[in-house]
Amino acid sequence: MGKRVYDPIHDTFQLREDNSDETKADSPMQSVKSGSQEEASPSSIQSETETVTTKSIPVIHEIEIDDKNDDDSTQSEEENTNILLNFEPSTVPEATGASTATGPVTTNTVRRKPKESNASKYNRHLKKPDGEPFNRKDIQFSFMQELLMDKRQIFTNVLKPLYKNSIVPINIDGDKLSINVTDKEYDARTFVFNDKLTFAQLYVLTIATSIKCSKILRDKLLLDQQVAFSTCVLALLVNIGRLNTTINFYLEMTSQLRTFHSVPVLQLHANDPKLLQDTPRLKSILKNLPWGNEQLSLMETYKKVDQNDGEVDTVNKFNIINMLFSICDNSGLIDKRFLSKYVEVESKAQEQDMVDEQNEVKETEAENEKQESKAAYATTLFDILDYSKYEPKDRSNILIWLLYIHLETNLSQEEVEESVRFFNGLEDGAPAGKFILRCTERSYDTDPEDELEFGANQRIKRREFMSKMEEGRKRERTNVTEVKKPSIGGDKSEEDGEGEDDKSEETVEETRSLLTPTPILESSSPMTLNRKKVTPQLPKVTPAAPTETEEEITSAAIIDKNDLNLTPLKKYNSSATVNKVDKLISLDLNKHVSENGKTQEEFLADLKKSQVPNRLKRRDIGLIKIFNEFEDIPVASVLGIRGKKRKKFKDNLLGFETDFMKNLGASKKVLLNKIERAEIDDEEATAMFKLE
């Protein structure tokens, strides 16, 4: 009998006989031959697990390959299977012994990951070239409008303490109306202290509490309906993952890391061109809220709900923006736990197919087809948020319901079913039922002609602006290269060795002379020694009679340094403009600004004169306060009594110095008492505390 020896090169166990000189450890070919002979006999295959043979034992490696980028990979699958890992050799099943082996074999079983069929949250962003507008269909305008128009006051107002000292509420006569950001009479002061709020009211109030929200934007969000509506629409698109942080809505944006896109439905009738906030700023506002912004794990929450419903309490613990972020990040959990159970897709074509199948097929086959049709028509959260194939009213109803059960209930099955009955308008005790998500063929998001024209004009203006920016950059680059360009000459003469300073000065003087409208003579600088002499001819310009209403136009000639061709450049004289500005300034100064017929300068002079007593009084009070509250220790340090350690004075600390400081403080009090008791008319006594 031989003994098994591990072969580290081939990662197999070989059989070595002690008495035979022919079979050695360094010659594995014989063991391979004997192994191949035994593989051919069925008896050897059956006794493989019981007795030790000379067959080399292959090692099976399980390699996990990510198949996400399988389409782009040019590497063959055979190259991936030749990977040797430092795994311990394992026993081969009997099925693997049927194949013949020519040597020590290492087989690897490749296990591929299934490709993701559903859309990822990272490829849902709106992507268009720079300058292309976002139309109504891109931003799902009808869906956003239905969300912000919802009148149900079902969300608890947890923002009262944040607005307690900053807003004065306005009382509405009669019954309380739910005013949303879609209403023309919108004013957040009418509902900021209500106990219950609508979705739009809670959303806009939450945005206004952000730490990154400026004072101006906060006031506009609370008082301006146009700003509040447009900001809520864009914030919702960022919140659900439809807009990434590389989008700007200002036409003259120059950042290379951003792309400009107009939104005609929000910008057409806007007065401010900078009405819309860019998406990086919106993301910063949404992520920096003062409360309820903690990390939320819906998976752990659902596990706690399944274990014990009583221990989970998520009511009023998170803000609505953070909750919407978490719902979109965990779309798979939402689909499995809620949408598959409580949402049913309904379409007319599907109903007709179901009726025909029930009439023709048996009952058992019909039931199977029903289940298959339900699975085929199953919807996801991203389908509801991104696509317009469903009714906007149904989509908004489902999204508000998802936010409601996560913010206002403990997510138990009883409360979830009760919320379904409430949203469907059913009575208590009735079956919970499901949400009906109706398919539609109607195109709700149709752009009118004026919005299409606005988007086209914005695209054209953007291209013109970018072309001007590119021309400016090219002009700057050419100017820099011309200044740094060395002088061109055939031979290096003495003029070439004058130094870089002289050349730079000459080029600067030359460029200055080029900008003047005077005729340019032939340059005698070293730069033009070896060039052909060219006599420049200025284009004749007919002088026009200057008037006050028309601008005087003069032509200046600029020399092209390559061929010395003259290109006329129009230069506008701003004398007429200056005269207009002077007239406007004089009219503004002579304009009567008060009821007494006084001009602006006279009114300012009277105002300064009336404020003189108050200014003197403030001056006196300030001087007395400074003199009274000024620390004595710096004074003592100046006099040389104390050291330079400016600590607060303590009794019986330094003896003589302590007595001196006490005397100084007492003298100050006596002096101040005399000044306070003195008469106000005595100017000589109080001259030191008054302005002369």
UniProtKB/Swiss-Prot annotation:
Q: What else is noted? A: Present with 1400 molecules/cell in log phase SD medium.
User: What function is annotated for this protein?
Assistant: Probably involved in transcription regulation via its interaction with the INO80 complex, a chromatin-remodeling complex.
Gene from which this protein is expressed: IES1
Q: Which residues carry this modification: Phosphoserine?
A: 27, 487, 493, 504
Subcellular location per UniProt equals: Nucleus
Q: Compositional bias of type Acidic residues: which residue ranges?
A: 64-80, 493-504
Originating organism: Saccharomyces cerevisiae (strain ATCC 204508 / S288c)
What's the subunit arrangement here? Component of the chromatin-remodeling INO80 complex, at least composed of ARP4, ARP5, ARP8, RVB1, RVB2, TAF14, NHP10, IES1, IES3, IES4, IES6, ACT1, IES2, IES5 and INO80.
Q: Which Gene Ontology BP annotations are present?
A: chromatin remodeling; DNA repair; regulation of DNA-templated transcription
Keyword hit for Phosphoprotein: yes
Main site of residence?
Answer: nucleus
- Name the chain's protein: Ino eighty subunit 1
Coiled coil: which residue ranges?
Answer: 340-385
Show the ranges annotated as biased composition (Basic and acidic residues): 1-25, 465-485
